[in-house]
């Protein structure tokens, strides 16, 4: 999965890393996942029509970024100096469990690349280079370069994330990560390379929160793909049974469902058909 870097991080844009640290795993057992997260991730990913409904909002952005005409899931940032620029997603969430993928090439992140959630009131532009998402009480963000969590960052220090990091350590991320927003529990979490990193923020209940990022790198392009969502109602017994069967088979053997001695209608159900 991602890699750990030791030493202080300087506020400079580095196009080519001088050293590629050895890959390493999480310390200890994976933190407990939110209820029903495995169920959500086991479901087929949302189709393009749903992804477009949950895409970046071309009407809710800094003027220095734009949603691409040929790829409505991706925004592009103009190379404007001394400016931090953000964009919100179209859909805000007040209930349910939701997951979306952020694809942000590591070489396009620069000194302040922040991913998180925000209310409709959070600012989307700031003069200078800063961790804009998480800078006030209206947003919650993970600075991908510094491996720090920010909320009300003008008044509160950042917190190391994942939690196993030391005070002078950072976590080098791959190009993609998953954001997990559980509005029923009021938590925000992240998944990297299939590893759940634990709860980043709590206390989000009662709000309506939108996907958001803020960027400083000129010509960076960031893509958001909504994975899926689950309403807060308890899952039906049939869904729980399907999840149990698919878990018993494992991802590598799901293709064997078609050869099981079961009625075709049940095979179809197990394959979300």
UniProtKB/Swiss-Prot annotation:
One cellular-component annotation, GO: cytosol
Subcellular location: Cytoplasm; Cytoplasm, Cytosol
Top-level taxon of the source organism: Eukaryota
PROSITE patterns named in the record: B302_SPRY, SOCS
Pfam entry (one): SPRY
GO biological process terms, semicolon-separated: intracellular signal transduction; positive regulation of protein polyubiquitination; proteasome-mediated ubiquitin-dependent protein catabolic process; protein ubiquitination; regulation of circadian rhythm; rhythmic process; ubiquitin-dependent protein catabolic process
Notes on the domains: The SOCS box domain mediates the interaction with the Elongin BC complex, an adapter module in different E3 ubiquitin ligase complexes. Essential for its ability to link NOS2 and the ECS E3 ubiquitin ligase complex components ELOC and CUL5.
Subunit structure as annotated in this protein's UniProt entry: Component of the probable ECS(SPSB4) E3 ubiquitin-protein ligase complex which contains CUL5, RNF7/RBX2, Elongin BC complex and SPSB4. Interacts with CUL5; RNF7; ELOB and ELOC. Interacts with MET. Interacts (via B30.2/SPRY domain) with PAWR; this interaction occurs in association with the Elongin BC complex. Interacts with NOS2. Interacts with EPHB2.
Name of the molecule in the record: SPRY domain-containing SOCS box protein 4
Upper classification of the organism: Eukaryota, Metazoa, Chordata, Craniata, Vertebrata
